[in-house]
């Protein structure tokens, strides 16, 4: 282990008399430290402001920002995307998602209740990642402060408006949990992707026809 060497700084002489205190004050006031602080203050005074008048003004958030959840609908039909599989409820680390379902006449799950306790949620985004239908996603509504300890969110608060989905007034979700736009370019090719199948023209050239094979037999 390397030996650490410490450099001891000279101790500052103690000031006792009033004359020495006055000299020390003048030296500190007219030294470089004062002008450095004033220079920084003047520089920041004339620099452009980085603050905004919240809540009248709000900064744009990233599309992958993790805030209050949002339940999606199909854009064309307006049907709910959630199939009631319960994966979001099982993977939730804070145990804040509660789903109650029943089996319908068509032997498919029907959702009776879907609640999220926003007071317990840590907004990790695991529910959005595990959802196979992209039904639950992370939105950008971060103003969810409440004076009540038991703060629950019902399904109607998170669900997209059916008429907006049918009219396609909103685009497909591109936030946290969605597939990246350039996912094809980022995917790594598997060994099977390098095996190229022969084209039809090459297979015709390599495989002789029946008439040519019969002519070869007659010549023999």
From Swiss-Prot:
Highest taxon in the source lineage: Bacteria
Residues reported to bind [4Fe-4S] cluster 2: 92, 121, 124, 127
Residues in 4Fe-4S ferredoxin-type domain copies: 71-102, 112-141
Cellular component terms per the entry's GO annotation: plasma membrane
GO BP terms: aerobic respiration
Cofactor(s) annotated in UniProt: [4Fe-4S] cluster
EC number: 7.1.1.-
InterPro entries in alphabetical order: 4Fe4S_Fe-S-bd, 4Fe4S_Fe_S_CS, NADH_quinone_OxRdtase_chainI
Main location: membrane
GO molecular function: 4 iron, 4 sulfur cluster binding; iron ion binding; NADH:ubiquinone reductase (non-electrogenic) activity; quinone binding
Membrane topology annotation: Peripheral membrane protein
Reaction equations catalysed: a quinone + NADH + 5 H(+)(in) = a quinol + NAD(+) + 4 H(+)(out)
Pfam short name (any one): Fer4_7
Presence of the UniProt keyword rRNA-binding in the record: no
Residues where [4Fe-4S] cluster 1 binds: 82, 85, 88, 131
Cellular localisation: Cell inner membrane
EC supergroup of this enzyme: translocase
Record keywords: 4Fe-4S, Cell inner membrane, Cell membrane, Iron, Iron-sulfur, Membrane, Metal-binding, NAD, Quinone, Repeat, Translocase, Ubiquinone
Region (Disordered): 187-220
Keyword Disulfide bond: no
Comment on bound cofactor: Binds 2 [4Fe-4S] clusters per subunit.
Family of this protein: Belongs to the complex I 23 kDa subunit family.
PANTHER family: NADH DEHYDROGENASE [UBIQUINONE] IRON-SULFUR PROTEIN 8, MITOCHONDRIAL, NADH DEHYDROGENASE UBIQUINONE IRON-SULFUR PROTEIN 8, MITOCHONDRIAL
Quaternary assembly: NDH-1 is composed of 14 different subunits. Subunits NuoA, H, J, K, L, M, N constitute the membrane sector of the complex.
Role, per record: NDH-1 shuttles electrons from NADH, via FMN and iron-sulfur (Fe-S) centers, to quinones in the respiratory chain. The immediate electron acceptor for the enzyme in this species is believed to be ubiquinone. Couples the redox reaction to proton translocation (for every two electrons transferred, four hydrogen ions are translocated across the cytoplasmic membrane), and thus conserves the redox energy in a proton gradient.
Protein name: NADH-quinone oxidoreductase subunit I
